[in-house]
């Protein structure tokens, strides 16, 4: 591909609104000014270097475009269950807990809820942002408060002013990383601003506040929980909905997908496997079938015991 072809290819994509200079810059490592100048043949720097970088970007772009398009989002029975808890917390200005095993679709459901509703904010807690200051800072950034104070007191007051009157919903993903002090801070923020709050994560989110592990601090928060949703495993209806979205309806394929979805990682493993199987089948001009699914399980070297499935 020569420089003229690269310029023409990029110009076509931008003019057809398939991408933007900003997106190309972000993904290629070049500045928007450099890309614009290069496309218009006005770049005074090393055109050869820039052309090589943009050729690599173009090749990757077209390779991705040729892949079979996965379903953007599948509204499963579990998704509806999670959304019900989120709507309840929002409408009643209360706290809800959504807990469950990894890979059952909690995070994707929350992201879609945020995308399709106004005044919904979501942050994901990591060990490095599990303190009061770091957690509140994450929330401030999510709220667009890029110049928020960097001290706990002023930051908490700024967040209260920002959230008051919004009738919004704050979703805290991976909330099992949070200790009593941070949860108490979030509880007070929720109460004072009358927003909804959803704490989401593994079962430790809830078990910390109940049973033998319950401390005085956790017990105070527990008494404020209005709704708890526990998702222990993937429902058969969820797998069927995902299979339908991928246009997979053979009995053997459905049975295999159902068995895999019961393993640790559930829908996450299922989606990775479906994408790889779809890529392989697409390259051969065929539809996804049982053989492609089994091959995908093998190639992904999944950390699940599927040996009995593959022998059947």
Curated annotation (Swiss-Prot):
<dbReference type="InterPro" id="IPR010982">
    <property type="entry name" value="Lambda_DNA-bd_dom_sf"/>
</dbReference>
<comment type="function">
    <text>Selects the target DNA sites for transposition. Recruits DDE-recombinase A to the target sites and catalytically activates it. Displays non-specific DNA-binding properties. Polymerizes as helical filaments around the DNA. Coating of the DNA by the target DNA activator B might play a role in favoring target-primed replication over integration. Prevents self-integration into an integrated copy of the viral genome.</text>
</comment>
<feature type="site" description="Involved in DNA binding">
    <location>
        <position position="151"/>
    </location>
</feature>
<dbReference type="GO" id="GO:0016887">
    <property type="term" value="F:ATP hydrolysis activity"/>
</dbReference>
<keyword id="KW-0229">DNA integration</keyword>
<keyword id="KW-0244">Early protein</keyword>
<dbReference type="GO" id="GO:0006260">
    <property type="term" value="P:DNA replication"/>
</dbReference>
<keyword id="KW-0815">Transposition</keyword>
<feature type="DNA-binding region">
    <location>
        <begin position="223"/>
        <end position="312"/>
    </location>
</feature>
<keyword id="KW-0547">Nucleotide-binding</keyword>
<dbReference type="InterPro" id="IPR036733">
    <property type="entry name" value="B_transposit_C_sf"/>
</dbReference>
<feature type="binding site">
    <location>
        <begin position="100"/>
        <end position="107"/>
    </location>
    <ligand>
        <name>ATP</name>
    </ligand>
</feature>
<dbReference type="InterPro" id="IPR027417">
    <property type="entry name" value="P-loop_NTPase"/>
</dbReference>
<protein>
    <recommendedName>
        <fullName>ATP-dependent target DNA activator B</fullName>
        <ecNumber>3.6.1.-</ecNumber>
    </recommendedName>
</protein>
<dbReference type="GO" id="GO:0005524">
    <property type="term" value="F:ATP binding"/>
</dbReference>
<dbReference type="GO" id="GO:0003677">
    <property type="term" value="F:DNA binding"/>
</dbReference>
<feature type="site" description="Sensor-2; involved in ATP-binding and hydrolysis">
    <location>
        <position position="268"/>
    </location>
</feature>
<dbReference type="InterPro" id="IPR049945">
    <property type="entry name" value="AAA_22"/>
</dbReference>
<feature type="site" description="Involved in DNA binding">
    <location>
        <position position="152"/>
    </location>
</feature>
<keyword id="KW-0067">ATP-binding</keyword>
<feature type="site" description="Sensor-1; involved in ATP-binding and hydrolysis">
    <location>
        <position position="202"/>
    </location>
</feature>
<dbReference type="InterPro" id="IPR052026">
    <property type="entry name" value="ExeA_AAA_ATPase_DNA-bind"/>
</dbReference>
<keyword id="KW-1194">Viral DNA replication</keyword>
<keyword id="KW-0238">DNA-binding</keyword>
<comment type="subunit">
    <text>Homomultimer. Polymerizes in presence of ATP, preferentially on DNA. ATP hydrolysis triggers polymers dissassembly. Interacts with DDE-recombinase A; this interaction stimulates the catalytic activity of the latter as well as the ATPase activity of MuB followed by its dissociation from DNA.</text>
</comment>
<dbReference type="Pfam" id="PF09077">
    <property type="entry name" value="Phage-MuB_C"/>
</dbReference>
<dbReference type="GO" id="GO:0046872">
    <property type="term" value="F:metal ion binding"/>
</dbReference>
<dbReference type="InterPro" id="IPR009084">
    <property type="entry name" value="B_transpositn_C"/>
</dbReference>
<keyword id="KW-0235">DNA replication</keyword>
<keyword id="KW-0460">Magnesium</keyword>
<feature type="DNA-binding region" description="H-T-H motif">
    <location>
        <begin position="21"/>
        <end position="40"/>
    </location>
</feature>
<dbReference type="GO" id="GO:0015074">
    <property type="term" value="P:DNA integration"/>
</dbReference>
<dbReference type="GO" id="GO:0039693">
    <property type="term" value="P:viral DNA genome replication"/>
</dbReference>
<keyword id="KW-1035">Host cytoplasm</keyword>
<dbReference type="GO" id="GO:0030430">
    <property type="term" value="C:host cell cytoplasm"/>
</dbReference>
<keyword id="KW-0378">Hydrolase</keyword>
<dbReference type="GO" id="GO:0006313">
    <property type="term" value="P:DNA transposition"/>
</dbReference>
<keyword id="KW-0479">Metal-binding</keyword>
<dbReference type="Pfam" id="PF13401">
    <property type="entry name" value="AAA_22"/>
</dbReference>
<feature type="site" description="R-finger; involved in ATP-binding">
    <location>
        <position position="224"/>
    </location>
</feature>
<comment type="similarity">
    <text>Belongs to the AAA ATPase family.</text>
</comment>
């Amino acid at each position: 591909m020569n420089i003229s072809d690269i310029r023409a290819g990029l110009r076509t994509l931008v003019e057809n609104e398939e991408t933007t200079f900003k997106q190309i810059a972000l993904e290629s490592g070049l500045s928007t000014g450099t890309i614009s100048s290069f496309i218009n043949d006005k770049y005074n720097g090393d055109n050869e270097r820039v052309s090589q970088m943009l050729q690599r970007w173009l090749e990757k772009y077209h390779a991705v475009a040729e892949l079979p398009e996965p379903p953007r989002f599948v509204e499963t029975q579990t998704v509806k269950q999670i959304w019900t808890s989120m709507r309840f917390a929002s409408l009643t200005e209360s706290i809800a807990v959504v807990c469950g095993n990894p890979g059952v679709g909690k995070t994707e459901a929350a992201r879609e809820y945020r995308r399709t509703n106004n005044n919904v904010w979501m942050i994901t807690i990591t060990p490095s942002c599990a303190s009061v200051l770091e957690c509140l800072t994450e929330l401030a950034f999510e709220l667009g408060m890029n110049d928020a104070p960097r001290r706990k007191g002023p930051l908490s007051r700024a967040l209260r002013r920002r959230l008051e009157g919004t009738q919004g919903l704050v979703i805290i993903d991976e909330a099992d990383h949070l200790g009593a002090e941070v949860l108490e801070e979030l509880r007070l923020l929720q109460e004072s601003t009358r927003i909804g709050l959803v704490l989401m994560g593994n079962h430790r989110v809830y078990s910390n506040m109940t049973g033998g592990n319950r401390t005085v601090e956790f017990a105070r928060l527990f008494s404020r929980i209005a709704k708890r949703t526990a998702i222990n495993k993937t429902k058969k209806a969820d797998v069927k909905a995902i299979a339908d979205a991928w246009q997979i309806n053979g009995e053997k394929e459905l049975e295999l997908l159902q068995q895999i979805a019961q393993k640790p990682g559930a829908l996450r493993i299922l989606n990775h496997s479906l994408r790889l199987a779809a890529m392989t089948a697409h390259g051969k001009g065929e539809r996804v079938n049982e053989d492609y699914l089994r091959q995908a399980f093998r190639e992904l070297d999944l950390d699940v015991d599927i040996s009995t499935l593959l022998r059947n």
